[in-house]
């Protein structure tokens, strides 16, 4: 339902933000 859609959208948004943030920090040395 609507709740599931909101969770999906939020996860997508957070994933994008996290990727942008990690990308700006550079790759961690393993």
From Swiss-Prot:
<keyword id="KW-0929">Antimicrobial</keyword>
<dbReference type="GO" id="GO:0006952">
    <property type="term" value="P:defense response"/>
</dbReference>
<comment type="similarity">
    <text>Belongs to the frog skin active peptide (FSAP) family. Dermaseptin subfamily.</text>
</comment>
<keyword id="KW-0878">Amphibian defense peptide</keyword>
<keyword id="KW-0964">Secreted</keyword>
<comment type="function">
    <text>Has antimicrobial activity.</text>
</comment>
<dbReference type="GO" id="GO:0005576">
    <property type="term" value="C:extracellular region"/>
</dbReference>
<protein>
    <recommendedName>
        <fullName>Dermaseptin-3.2TR</fullName>
    </recommendedName>
</protein>
